[in-house]
Amino acid sequence: MPIKIPDQLPATEVLREENIFFMQESRATTQAIRPLKVIILNLMPKKIETETQFLRLLSNSPLQVDVELLRIDNRTSKNTPTEHLDTFYRQFEGIKDRNFDGLIITGAPLGLVQFEDVIYWDHLQTIMTWAKDHVTSSLYVCWAAQAGLKLLYDLPKRTRKEKLSGVYKHTNLDQHHPILRGFDDQFLAPHSRYADFSADYLKSHTDLDILATSKEAGVYLAATKDKRNVFVTGHPEYDSFTLHNEYVRDLGEGMEPTIPVNYYPDDNPDITPKATWRSHGHLLFSNWLNYCVYQQTPYDLEHFSEQNFTRDE
């Protein structure tokens, strides 16, 4: 949370240059606090596992967050009981007239499927378009990042020859960007995807701020200038065994997956893996909630509009 300082304090410029989060007194007196309303569109097959992973990260914040779960309308799930979906998940028709502070769209195992061949592609586009006028900040994760780039920038699907799987080192490219506050100069995060996110390609075809990259994995973190759209190409929400379970699954299906990079001790799948990205995941989601959502969203969501957004001091 920010420190509150007098409006004309000489230290203001120094604090701003050092990326210290502060709020001037005139703004602090007008900032009211209420629970943030965040909705998660869960596209993953194992919905209970995925919702647990994201809720874990959203919980590590001093802000109160009211979370709702969203499903693709009338889609049955092979891996999640119908009664769970009916009890805990909303359908788009039921929420389309409401506004939210944040939207998270999860990944989906559709790396080798063309967008137009995704059964729910039209419905997903409808939700992403709706978010422009109903959500303060949207967070697109892994496959959803690729889908979001297609919708917002009409970028074609770019696919790697081999699946990227493992835990990779990333470089913090802008220590003064709010999303990266508190990040180490280099940090680890897991990836599990076929999508290719080249930094040069995104720089030449979008106006995104490229915030973190990896030599092996390409762009990991990017955002629009107004922070209303944030793209995470990896899986910071994964728990310790998610990559292992995917590896075992692929082996069981007769595939020949490579051992996830930098994941198992001594690259030995028989040794219990360790999560080396947990603190990064918590900090990323905490920063998104604070700087992209809470600091920008209007207090009264019923009067949501572009003009309502507050800006960094």
Swiss-Prot record:
It catalyses: L-homoserine + succinyl-CoA = O-succinyl-L-homoserine + CoA. GO terms for cellular component: cytoplasm. Its EC number is 2.3.1.46. GO terms for biological process: L-methionine biosynthetic process from homoserine via O-succinyl-L-homoserine and cystathionine. It comes from the Bacteria. The keyword Transferase applies. The record marks G111 as: Important for acyl-CoA specificity. Belongs to the MetA family. This is Homoserine O-succinyltransferase. It comes from Aliivibrio fischeri (strain MJ11) (Vibrio fischeri). The gene is metAS.
